[in-house]
């Protein structure tokens, strides 16, 4: 898309395995009048390399290439929490020279609530905290501002920093049975609340939890929730 000062960094999962997640995020920012760029050939953040092999020279080379692209922008909105965590923590700790301001998609979306003016309903919602946001970046409030603006927030027993893993697309490729059990356990937690809809901020967790969704329950993305509330 056209070059602006702001890059929406979709991330590997949203680009290749969770396109709905990417499309809804783009639609929401457009609806709010945000001027931003999406790259046709987005660099790899290096998160997968760091997860699989750690802080190797290869991992750092991948990240350095990403920095060259990211530094062409003043602001980078990281749609996927794994990328946000990698940009804000590993890039900084390893001195990779990232100068662009990095913001999480959830914090940006919460900041747009006054402009979007979602209609609050009595619908009961529960949020799946991604560990990268809640633990690594200590971000828990923006998502709750969004849920409370759209409906009634019903917390699961294990939430915030105590969040429970909801699944992972990379791990689902080589241990699908384990991921099925992980997702099923999280749905059990969800069903212990009064909520009707589970709201996700991670493309990876969204897709795995959706694969194992119990009948009669609903799952949406943060952007999808807001788009529905703004109709």
Locate the predicted segments by residue.
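Iron-sulfur cluster-binding electron-transfer modules in prokaryotic oxidoreductases
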Residues: 1-231
